[in-house]
Amino acid sequence: MNISENTMQILKNYGTINPNFIARKGNTIMTVSEAKNILSSSNIEEQFEQDMGIYDLNEFLNVLSLVDQPKLDMEEKWVTISDQTGRSKIKYFFTDPEMLTSPTEKMIQNAGNMESFEISFTLDNDTLNKVKRAASALGHTSMKVESKDTDGVVLMVFDTENPTSNTFSIDVPGQGQGEGQYVINISNLKIVPGDYDVKISNKNISNFIHKEKPIQYWIALEK
């Protein structure tokens, strides 16, 4: 089995959410943060032949980079990673899945059953980068998502502890069910670059769906 560039990008992203990783048999991969406040699911091009538990995903990805165009051959307790010529080989042992933090299919199903949303908006990659740069410049960690009415949504970088702090705001296309505001910790926006359809629920959870790739995230809101 070969790993595509798209899948490598997703795996690198998942490594920032949680180093523990289990690739379940099939073509759906998932991850959840240790704090259970970031959950993600993605369909990939490859088909895993069996479950594969990885204790440190970032280390595993670094190992893959040791060979050009790595090819994976699964065994019961390890995977053999080789280059296309077969000259270079790495034997990498799996970790018992019981020792790893990973999401269950039920967690994904429950998150996917969100039916009612208070705010929905489009978040393009350029806007997200502006939000992150503003947070870094101002020294803030929170982003407020606010709908004034049924037409238009405002994202604001601010300090939750200081009402007189400097702020950055940007309008985005979207709508809400009347007036409402919700807060997301910007450090939890560990998502693959791209444009997203975002929905905010009053159940203290947000859903980020990538517009071009089959990947989505559920990110907890700040209470």
Located regions from the model:
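DNA polymerase processivity clamps
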Residues: M1-D96, M114-K223
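Long, charge-dense
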Residues: T95-E115
